[in-house]
Regions:
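Conserved two-metal-ion catalytic palm core of "right-hand" nucleic acid polymerases
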Residues: 1-262
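Active-site palm subdomain of RNA-directed nucleic acid polymerases
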Residues: 233, 270-288
Length: 288
């Protein structure tokens, strides 16, 4: 018998965003962020001792999260943390004739993403609820998810050991945000809403934006959240949400302003903020 369990999540655990920034289907089978998440969450208990040196603790402090390095000043920690990083590029099979070029974000930048979620998750969801047409958008920070288990398989004690992957699957959802809309494009075309639209309209126009990530201008996210003239007038105020988001995306992509990394969930959220403004502008134009 299949049992449906409602698993509660710790909304304050912002580092769980590390577990879902890369989709399992987009990564080699031998790779996951589970180990990074575990080492960071257990750092205080295991590694936070200057006399206790391990390769893992050294790697975390020197490469991944300089905030953990108490041997340098606070100013140096902040400077090291904000340094630019370069994504690791790789390819996966898209279909029988082509490949997808994806980017794996540097661990330090992924942590910066997570901390940005911690500070601005409510602002993100506020700005992704504006469009009436978005197919997939962050609705709120996830606080629970449903897990389906086969009770017959767990009724008796078996020989298999409990793996970290099994434990993580029981504790954490597949996404940091709870999403509205459709999680796969084919579900849109199979939905009742789409069938009803087909009955009402005889023609459908489609615009292919599959390659837009390569050409998104990072400054445009600030223009989408406010407007271009406002941002130019207040360009010195670098602590605004849009400017911080713009800078964070640049630093994680080798300081590039032209294009954003493909494959990261953070990039999808970034692009969604821009497309929400496009949706609103189109709707306003059609209704005027």
């Amino acid at each position: 018998m299949v049992i449906k369990k409602n698993i509660k999540l710790d909304k304050k655990d912002y580092l769980r965003a590390l577990l879902c920034d890369t989709l399992p289907g987009d990564c080699p089978i031998i790779f996951s962020n589970d180990g990074l998440y575990i080492n960071l969450t257990e750092y205080d208990r295991v590694c936070n001792d200057l006399l206790h040196f391990t390769p893992v603790s050294s790697f975390l402090k020197k490469i991944v999260n300089p905030n953990l390095d108490s041997s340098i000043s606070v100013a140096d920690r902040h400077r090291e943390k904000k340094k630019q990083s370069s994504p690791f590029g790789y390819c996966i099979v898209k279909d029988a004739f082509s490949q997808r070029h994806l980017s794996l974000i540097h661990p330090r930048s992924q942590i910066n993403y997570s901390e940005f979620y911690k500070t601005y998750s409510s602002v993100i969801t506020l700005n992704t609820l504006k469009s009436n047409f978005s197919i997939r958008y962050p609705r709120k920070v996830a606080n629970s998810f449903f897990l389906y288990e086969n009770n017959a398989l767990e009724k008796y004690k078996g020989e298999d050991i409990e793996t970290t992957k099994d434990e993580l699957m029981r504790k954490y959802s597949s996404s940091y945000f709870s999403y509205g809309g459709f999680n796969r494009i084919y579900k849109l075309f199979q939905s009742k809403m789409f069938i009803e639209l087909e009955k009402r309209f005889s023609v459908m126009w489609m615009l292919d934006v599959s390659h837009c990530f390569d050409s998104i201008y990072t400054h445009s996210v600030s223009w989408a959240l406010k407007n271009k003239s406002y941002i130019k007038k207040h360009v010195k105020h670098s602590n605004q949400f849009g400017q911080e988001l713009d800078t964070l995306m640049q630093r994680s992509n080798n300081n590039e302003t032209n294009g954003i990394p493909i494959g990261s969930e953070f990039s999808r959220v970034f692009a969604e903020l821009i497309f929400q403004r496009i949706d609103c502008n189109i709707e306003s134009c059609l209704l005027s």
